């Protein structure tokens, strides 16, 4: 049983998957920092000193009544909130990550597949058929008589 598990783990696709997950998590952290620390502060500044992480709607006040200065204060007070600013940050994270995956993974793979397909189209396919000169149907290359029109072939 342990031997089978070892064979399963050592297969290339399992190891590739593990490496992909680790790199994906690290890349996700980089994108998250890019959005939170680099992109959103200037956008918030342009929109009048708005911190997107602190955009929320209070549905029900907590033990300590509002208004709340920040999302953290509202959550500490036990208020029920809709955190649409955090959602905007997550949406921008997703869009950047999706664009990066598209431009660095999907698009190159599609181009590689298209090149491979064009190479296959250039190489003529080997065939074991020929056209009958009398009825123009496909017949075996070694045929001496057409099975369709019964003409003798040379």
UniProtKB/Swiss-Prot annotation:
Annotated source species: Dehalococcoides mccartyi (strain ATCC BAA-2100 / JCM 16839 / KCTC 5957 / BAV1)
Compartments where found: Cell membrane
Keywords attached to this entry: Cell membrane, Ion channel, Ion transport, Membrane, Transmembrane, Transmembrane helix, Transport
InterPro entries (UniProt xref): Mechanosensitive_channel_CS (IPR019823), MS_channel (IPR001185), MSC/AndL (IPR037673), MscL_channel (IPR036019)
TM annotation in the entry: 14-34, 86-106
MF term (GO), any: mechanosensitive monoatomic ion channel activity
Function: Channel that opens in response to stretch forces in the membrane lipid bilayer. May participate in the regulation of osmotic pressure changes within the cell.
Keyword Ion transport: yes
NCBIfam families, alphabetized: mscL
Organism superkingdom: Bacteria
Intrachain disulfide bonds: none
One Pfam family recorded for the sequence: MscL
Membrane topology: Multi-pass membrane protein
Protein name: Large-conductance mechanosensitive channel
Subunit structure: Homopentamer.
């Amino acid at each position: 049983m342990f031997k089978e598990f070892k064979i399963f783990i050592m297969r290339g696709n399992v190891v590739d998957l593990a490496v992909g997950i680790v790199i994906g998590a690290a890349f996700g952290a980089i994108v998250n920092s890019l959005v939170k620390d680099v992109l959103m502060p200037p956008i918030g500044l342009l929109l009048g000193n708005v911190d997107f992480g602190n955009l929320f709607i209070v549905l029900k006040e907590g033990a300590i009544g509002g208004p709340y200065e920040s999302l953290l204060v509202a959550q500490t007070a036990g208020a029920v909130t809709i955190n649409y600013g955090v959602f905007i940050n997550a949406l921008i994270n997703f869009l950047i990550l999706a664009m990066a995956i598209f431009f660095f993974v999907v698009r190159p793979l599609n181009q590689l597949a298209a090149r491979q397909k064009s190479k296959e189209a250039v190489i003529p396919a080997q065939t074991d058929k020929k056209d009958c000169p009398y009825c123009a149907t496909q017949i075996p290359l070694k045929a001496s008589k057409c099975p369709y029109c019964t003409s003798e072939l040379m």
